[in-house]
Amino acid sequence: MLSKGRSPRRKQVQTQRKAALVLSVTPMVPVGSVWLAMSSVLSAFMRELPGWFLFFGVFLPVTLLLLLLIAYFRIKLIEVNEELSQNCDRQHNPKDGSSLYQRMKWT
């Protein structure tokens, strides 16, 4: 029996949501049931979540953060490469005024 204002579809959706909640809470459930419960929860989540929020609130900030991290580590890598090349030049080129070079020059 349906009460006034309730359609069979609404009642079916509510029972599916309750079943998904029960399946997601129960610890010893077969894998197929977990997949069914998870898919219904995800579909309900995607129905309620606006697309613009998903794009501007999740996808865009994560993408910008990853690009920022890539740029930061690239800058640090370039700095380290420059320091290593300067140290390597100093070791192979003793004309920088080191005392060992000056001693060898005087003898």
Swiss-Prot record:
GO cellular component, one term: membrane
Cell compartments where the protein resides: Membrane
Protein species of origin: Homo sapiens
Key words of the record: Membrane, Transmembrane, Transmembrane helix
Main location (coarse class): membrane
Protein name: Small leucine-rich protein 1
Transmembrane parts of this sequence: 19-39, 53-73
Region (Disordered): 85-107
Membrane topology value: Multi-pass membrane protein
